[in-house]
Amino acid sequence: MLRIADKTFDSHLFTGTGKFASSQLMVEAIRASGSQLVTLAMKRVDLRQHNDAILDPLIAAGVTLLPNTSGAKTAEEAIFAAHLAREALGTNWLKLEIHPDARWLLPDPIETLKAAETLVQQGFVVLPYCGADPVLCKRLEEVGCAAVMPLGAPIGSNQGLETRAMLEIIIQQATVPVVVDAGIGVPSHAAQALEMGADAVLVNTAIAVADDPVNMAKAFRLAVDAGLLARQSGPGSRSHFAHATSPLTGFLEASA
């Protein structure tokens, strides 16, 4: 069971809604993933329509919506988008994203911290997308963020846990949930994140662009469950030396 702020989740896999070929495929994949928390870019929702092709199927699926501020380049823009999301969707939960460079989509640490502090004071449950910077993650935690979402690699790159060493430090020192966000490309990456101590992962591109998104979503669900179970089972420690699994000389001594 994963608890973030006032909500609990059975699934440790969060999913996104972008890049799917259709809204029907998106919903089928989300259901197959078992995800209970789904991110939604406000810039993709047409609030003027009574029947939005993205929003309505998600509401019908019964998932918790996590609107994000993707597209914001400054703290001011993100705060404005956050208030629009709260008014439109009736939720104070927010994935805070501020990335000024459209080529790399790397989060701006200064603007993110500034926006996070303000939004927490304004009553939002803030989950910030951020770089894998242990100092920044601690600062975000200190200003009241409900979780931190450090990247594994650039958004949509499918490179996996390129920031593993920093993620390990973040996980070790965090007192709020750590959700590895961005760069996870295959189910084994998700399993590794849970094994190393992450509380959850957020996956979008790897599922949405797969040849079979529904089965890929199932694969991620199983991988996350496996990674969590492996961690809870207490894996053996790594060693630079070999350790025999059975006696090497006992049978020789017995026959002497």
UniProtKB/Swiss-Prot annotation:
User: What's a single GO BP term from this record?
Assistant: thiamine diphosphate biosynthetic process
- Location(s) in or outside the cell: Cytoplasm
Annotated signal peptide:
none
Identify this protein by name: Thiazole synthase
Supply the source organism for this entry: Escherichia fergusonii (strain ATCC 35469 / DSM 13698 / CCUG 18766 / IAM 14443 / JCM 21226 / LMG 7866 / NBRC 102419 / NCTC 12128 / CDC 0568-73)
The answer to whether UniProt assigns keyword Cytoplasm to this entry is yes
Q: Quaternary state and partners of this protein? A: Homotetramer. Forms heterodimers with either ThiH or ThiS.
- Where is the major localization of this protein? cytoplasm
